[in-house]
Design a protein with these regions (language model features):
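N-terminal active-site segment of His-dependent metallophosphoesterases
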Residues: 1-66
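Active-site environment of divalent metal-dependent phosphoester hydrolases
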Residues: 20-24, 51-54, 75-81, 145, ...
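Beta-strand-turn-beta hairpins that frame and shape the catalytic cleft
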Residues: 4-14, 128-136, 182-186, 215-217
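Anionic-ligand binding region
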Residues: 154-193
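Active-site neighborhood of phospho(di)ester-bond hydrolases with catalytic His/Asp-centered motifs
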Residues: 16-17, 42-48, 69-74, 138, ...
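Metal-dependent catalytic neighborhoods of phosphoester/phosphodiester hydrolases
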Residues: 25, 49-66, 80-92, 148, ...
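Acidic, His/Gly-rich catalytic cores of divalent-metal-dependent hydrolytic chemistry
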Residues: 8, 181-291
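Active-site neighborhood of divalent metal-dependent phosphoester bond hydrolases
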Residues: 66-127, 151-165
Length: 291
């Protein structure tokens, strides 16, 4: 993946991932940004605008009209190309792969040609200058758009940071929010808004990155929204019950993609927190834990 030109921002930067066709969650996120007086140019989405939920076209329209920055996820890549599957990277015949056949078929039938063209034109990488640091924004890994990278994957994250050609990376895809500072370099995942964080609550997650004299402060925030309506619409439209129930229970229907380190954290409530990525390169704790 070639490094693009750099967009300079003053901050704060609001980051979120995975709207997943969840209209109620996406509306709530954008309303929260307005409440905080964060301009669209200071908001970035890490991709997968469309996936599991009931309103693919309305969410695309909402995101496009909002004027925020978006990078291409695997779902955009697949829908733009009218591919046979979502390109999510699920193991063959896993529960996630079987369920994805159902929601991807629904999404593919409810996205118009103009939206496919828009998705196909999204950048795979966006580089931002914030607080004197260069941050590469992408969906999965540097060279693999659907690579699952979790907080416990220290060696894999370190290798990705070696390859990224920037001071840090902002990514998505795995569905869980976390921040790691490894050898003075940042790997940050804001989580997603279209599904809960597998913590037993229906909240979604987003983050704020704010430059300060001593570094960049990274805040993880959970937010409630009208998940009842979002789940009801999924059921009315015949989408997989496991994901509709997940919107209510806060628990994923399958944990196939999780590492052994992340599996025991299923159902453990996340609490908002913050990490300082220090200017001087000093060691920094991670969130939600120091891995």
């Amino acid at each position: 993946m070639d490094a693009p030109d750099v967009v300079t921002l003053d901050g704060p930067l609001l980051v979120f991932g995975g709207p997943y066709g969840n209209l109620e969650a996406t509306e709530a996120l954008l309303a929260e940004a307005r409440r905080r007086a964060i301009a669209p140019s200071q908001i970035v989405c890490t991709g997968d605008v469309v996936a599991y939920c009931a309103d693919p076209q309305p969410v695309i329209d909402l995101v496009r009209d909002s004027g925020i920055r978006v990078v291409m996820g695997n779902c955009e890549e697949s829908l733009a190309a009218q591919a046979a599957d979502c390109g999510c990277g699920f193991a063959e015949d896993s529960a996630c792969a079987v369920l994805s056949d159902q929601w991807y078929d629904y999404a593919d039938r409810h996205v118009d040609a103009a939206s496919r063209a828009w998705m196909g034109g999204l950048p795979r990488r966006l580089d931002l200058a914030l607080g004197g640091r260069r941050l590469a924004v992408m969906h999965g890994g540097v060279d693999e758009i659907s690579r699952f990278l979790f907080a416990s994957d220290t060696a894999a994250l370190d290798a990705e940071l070696d390859a990224v050609g920037a001071d840090g990376a902002i990514a998505g895809h795995c569905g869980l929010p976390f921040t790691r500072v490894i050898g003075g370099r940042l790997w940050h995942n804001a989580g997603v808004v279209g599904m809960p964080a597998n913590d037993g609550t229906p909240r979604f997650w987003f983050s704020l990155l704010t430059p300060r004299p001593d570094g960049i402060r990274i805040e993880h925030h959970g937010l409630g929204y009208d998940h009842v309506t979002a789940a009801r619409k999924m059921r009315e439209r015949g989408l997989p019950e496991g994901y509709a129930a997940a919107l209510e229970t806060g628990l994923w229907p399958s944990c196939d993609v999780l590492t052994p380190a992340e599996l025991p954290e299923r159902g453990i409530r996340l609490e908002p927190g913050a990490v300082l990525w220090p200017t001087d390169g000093a060691a920094a704790d991670g969130w939600p834990r120091a891995a």
